[in-house]
Regions:
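Soluble FAD-dependent oxygen oxidases
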Residues: 2-537
């Protein structure tokens, strides 16, 4: 996500939390609590003691680790409890033990890789729970002879890009723009980035996986079966088990690529260009991806306008890009001076918002430093937004101010893959996907500010309803949004799940529920937007 720090205040990672830890209040609870911790060493590899990986609220580093990989500070305001423990797994058996013992002693398990869940479901719950933190399981094993790699769940997108670049300057992988995303969760919801039109989603290039099921078994593609392998690619893995690692197929990229950013304000014809972009961007050759990103700006007093950025990535050199743009989108007026040529791995820095010339070593920074209060929502568009609709969008942006919108074109490879190929169903027929995000600072207040900004995000979402997909109004699971429907922390009502399930997974929801019934019939793996087992008839 490329966000200007001049627009949104930066706040410290450390904040004062008004939530309390869940500690046993009677003897029965205390027995369960103690039994859980005594269970863990018995179920894990003794050569790598799990006791060294367990943090409780009594540990001095507990609060630091809890917050370190919790990237949306808003979620703490609504949290009623902290976890009874954090298991910072250092060996696959630690994750297996967490499943077996949490299940045996009736603790809910939340799985966290990078901590980028927009609603914080990977590290909050309203019932006694344990966080299984996968961050230390971050190995990346690349085999250039087969152009494949095994990537553990705790590795970040930045680490993956860096390790590929160590081996080759003509290989890459299609996944997120943000470089601190945990691979485990990012891939499980689909995983997309600026290679989406050329190579599809991350999951479209996954060829195997290791999954821990509700019985603590480690399964691969063959042993889990094709139905489960289908479900974990785009269906949100934490409904089905715990991803240990993904096996991916690397993709080919040229030695040099070209990136650009062209900005136009409303006074410079941005509305006409945005209208034209909708018609052009989804139909461009696969090698070219152009994101449209409008943001409100204030030139002083009441002199507000909207500046629209056209951010492009081309798998080729500048001369070829200019020839293509002169034919397909001459209205943008792209010039040679707008273009920057660089290696593919350097282009990942460009998209992440690092300054030109930054060392690729920044890709190894695994934790997002600047935390924010935020609320995000998503939409899919199957028809061009009329100019009147764009003007509505501009007006709401100027009214709200602290908000950003990203419009990402589809077409290309996404048109070619069936919506039944994986659990990810948003394929052909979509022109673009949109992220709406609003952010605010700690200085603006706590609960009251949160309520106000969340309501503003809903105002924008409602304003765009006439133009977005409908029946259902589709949403992207990696842009988690509890507004579209949810369950309680410890319950998964099927009728409630159908509401958000249809929006996230369209017609694939029922098949996902059927798979859930087979691999996790007692619904051990659950959260507020998980997939329930399909009821038996």
């Amino acid at each position: 996500m490329k966000i200007s720090s001049s627009i949104f205040p930066i706040i410290s990672i450390f904040i004062l939390l008004s939530i309390s830890s869940v500690t046993p209040s009677d003897s029965d609870d205390s027995d369960d609590f103690d039994d859980f911790f005594q269970c863990l060493p018995k179920q894990s590899d003794s050569s790598i003691p799990i006791t060294d990986a367990i943090l409780t609220p009594n540990n001095s580093s507990f609060q630091y680790i809890y917050q370190l990989r919790a990237n949306n500070l808003r979620t703490f305001l609504s949290a009623t409890s902290r976890p009874v423990a954090i298991i910072t797994a250092r060996h696959p058996s630690h994750a297996q033990a967490a499943v077996i013992c949490a299940k045996r002693h009736d603790f809910q398990l939340r799985i966290r890789s990078g901590g980028h869940d927009y609603e914080g479901l990977s590290y909050t719950s309203d019932v006694p729970f344990v966080i299984l933190d996968m961050f230390n399981l971050n190995s990346i094993d690349i085999d250039m002879s087969t152009e494949t790699a095994w990537v553990q769940a705790g590795a970040t997108t930045g680490e993956l890009y860096y390790r590929i670049a160590e081996k080759s300057n003509v290989h890459g992988f299609p996944s997120g723009v943000c470089t601190t995303l945990g691979i485990g969760g990012h891939f499980s919801g689909g995983g997309y980035g600026f290679l989406i039109r050329k190579y599809g989603l991350s999951i479209d290039n996954v060829i195997d996986a290791q999954l821990i099921d509700a019985n603590g078994r480690i399964l691969n593609r063959k042993s889990m079966g094709e139905d489960v392998f289908w479900a974990i690619r785009g269906g949100g893995t934490t409904s089905f088990g715990i991803i240990l690692s993904w096996r991916i197929k690397l993709v080919r990229v040229p030695p040099r690529v070209t990136v650009f950013t062209v900005q136009r304000t409303l006074e410079q014809g941005a509305t006409e260009l945005a209208y034209r972009w909708q018609q052009v961007a989804p139909k461009l050759p696969k090698d070219l991806f152009i994101r449209l990103q409008p943001e409100p700006i204030n030139n002083g007093g009441n002199n507000k306008t909207v500046r629209v950025s056209f951010i492009g990535h081309f798998l080729g050199q500048a001369d070829g890009l200019l020839r293509l743009m002169n034919v397909s989108f001459p209205e943008l007026g792209l010039t040679r001076n707008d273009c920057l040529q660089m290696s593919w791995v350097e282009s990942t820095l460009y998209w992440a918002g690092f300054s030109n010339g930054s060392s690729i070593d920044v890709l190894l920074d695994r934790v997002a430093v600047n935390k924010v209060f935020a609320k995000e929502k998503s939409d899919y568009y199957k028809a061009v937004i009329p100019k009147q609709g764009l003007e509505t969008l501009w007006q709401v942006l100027m009214d709200i101010e602290n908000i950003f919108v990203q419009m990402n074109p589809y077409g290309g490879r996404m048109e070619e893959i069936s919506d039944l190929e994986t659990a990810f169903a948003h394929r052909a027929g979509n022109l673009f996907k949109v992220l709406y995000g609003i952010q605010w600072s700690e200085s603006e207040g706590g609960v009251n500010a949160t309520a106000r900004y969340v309501e503003l995000s809903r105002r924008l979402y409602n304003a765009m309803a006439p133009y977005a997909s409908s029946n259902p109004r589709e949403a992207f699971i990696n842009y988690r949004d509890l507004d579209i429907g949810s369950n309680e922390s410890d319950e998964t009502d099927f009728e409630d799940a159908k509401e958000y399930g249809a929006k996230y997974f369209r017609n694939n929801f029922i098949r996902l529920a059927d798979v859930k019934a087979k691999i996790d019939p007692k619904n051990f793996f659950k959260n507020e937007q998980s997939i329930p087992p399909l009821p038996s008839h």
